[in-house]
């Protein structure tokens, strides 16, 4: 019983560390990914994305899109 409780706690700690590392990697970049907020002046989208003038977030770049 004690062993299974320790495994559950250990699993939750690993899950928390993994999500924290992913969030740190995401915010550490100087550009925004899909649906990240942007304004085109101080915050920019990563390559492959364009800043939507209507919604002010990054969307997939495709031919014909401004």
Swiss-Prot record:
> At the top level of its lineage, which domain of life is listed?
Eukaryota
PTM annotation (Proline amide): residues: 63
What is known about the tissue distribution of this protein? Expressed by the venom gland.
**What residues make up the propeptide removed on maturation?**
22-29
**Subcellular localization:** Secreted
First-listed, main subcellular location of the protein, grouped into a coarse class:
secreted
Care to name a GO molecular-function term for this sequence? toxin activity
Quote the InterPro entries the UniProt record gives: Huwentoxin-1, Huwentoxin_CS1
Which keywords are on file for this protein?
Amidation, Disulfide bond, Ion channel impairing toxin, Knottin, Secreted, Signal, Toxin
| Domain remark from Swiss-Prot or TrEMBL | The presence of a 'disulfide through disulfide knot' structurally defines this protein as a knottin.
User: What's the miscellaneous note?
Assistant: Several genes are coding for U1-theraphotoxin-Cg1a for which the structure by NMR has been determined. The cross-references to PDB can be found in entry JZT7A_CHIJI (AC P0C2X7).
Q: Which family does it belong to?
A: Belongs to the neurotoxin 10 (Hwtx-1) family. 46 (Jztx-7/10/12) subfamily.
The free-text function statement in the UniProt record for this protein reads: Probable ion channel inhibitor.
- Protein name (database record): U1-theraphotoxin-Cg1a 2
């Amino acid at each position: 019983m004690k062993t299974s409780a320790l495994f559950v706690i250990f699993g939750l700690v690993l899950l928390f560390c993994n999500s924290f590392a992913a969030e740190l990697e995401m915010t550490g970049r100087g550009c925004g990914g899909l649906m990240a907020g942007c304004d085109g002046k101080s915050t920019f989208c990563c390559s492959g994305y364009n800043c939507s003038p209507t919604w002010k977030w990054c969307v997939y770049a495709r031919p014909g899109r401004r």
